[in-house]
Amino acid sequence: FTTGDATAEERPLAVLLDCEFWAQSMPVWPALTSLTHRRQLPPAVYVLIDAIDTTHRANELPCNADFWLAVQQELLPQVKAIAPFSDRADRTVVAGQSFGGLSALYAGLHWPERFGCVLSQSGSYWWPHRGGHQEGELLEQLKTGEVSAEGLRIVLEAGVREPMIMQANQALYAQLHPLKESIFWRQVDGGHDALCWRGGLMQGLIDLWQPLFHDRS
């Protein structure tokens, strides 16, 4: 899906996980088109990736290197042949919810040269230790210095009515806080709620791509 008019090779790219949700259950096309016309979002290319089913989703999204290698080496070149986009990391957003939020940050931390902007909503940062009694894998990697968020722009959003996820997101935000100029933290009055996610997705894209408007001015 593409929006607006711009030099094709300069268009930013957004990779949205859970295609079937954003394409069918709660379509984002009208909002993306409207925000682009109002110059709140730049003309862009949007790639929506289908989770297939819950089993595939649970296997492919949580911190799965093979999944993201396939996206970069197989999927994106095919997309680019149809709808050219920029290769710049600072123009590329990867966005997801729950396991998708975890996956989005995983992609940014492990391939920052490709995915420079992360939009995580209700990210499952407890993974793989459900219950909240042990730190999740990504937080452990950040604390040990195995990965770094330096240079990334990150939106973190979680709801007050999802306590385990909120706790994990707060711990992650505390770890990322030294990078506060490039971290957007939002605590919403909701739970694991698609209605909250839709509005947060739009605002997150606006926040992450705002510097592009300054680049063009």
Where are these regions (language model features)?
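Non-catalytic cap/lid and distal C-terminal segments of serine-dependent acyl enzymes
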Residues: 1-217
